[in-house]
């Protein structure tokens, strides 16, 4: 989609507004950190445990999520014969046709049984 003049103008004005307000915002953040840094940290410690970075990295382990249902990679069926919820009916029908095509065997031609 092409960029309209209006959207270009709005983007330009937002950038100028950010430039104008940046010093005020920086001062506001610095004042918050100067006055109440200890108070803020005390509130955070009450709510959650604060760990140093090294301990947090050591504590992190590579655990994988346990998945209860096992799916066949080729047919995408789970152990109960159900397709995934995101699959639409056309895809299900196509996979089912492929699966049944392999199962069919040629029948012996009917003839006179003597």
Curated annotation (Swiss-Prot):
Annotated family: Belongs to the learning-associated protein family.
CC annotations in GO: chromosome; nucleolus
InterPro entries reported in the protein's UniProt record: LLPH-like
Phylogenetic classification of the source organism: Eukaryota, Metazoa, Chordata, Craniata, Vertebrata
UniProt organism field: Gallus gallus (Chicken)
Entry's localization field: Nucleus, Nucleolus; Chromosome
Function: Regulates dendritic and spine growth and synaptic transmission.
Biased composition regions of type Basic residues, renumbered to the chain: 1-21, 91-108
UniProt cross-references to Pfam families, sorted A to Z: LLPH
Alphabetic keyword roster: Chromosome, Nucleus
Region spans: Disordered: 1-23, 91-114
GO biological process assignments: dendrite extension; positive regulation of dendritic spine development
The protein's name in its UniProt record: Protein LLP homolog
UniProt-recorded Gene Ontology molecular function terms: basal RNA polymerase II transcription machinery binding
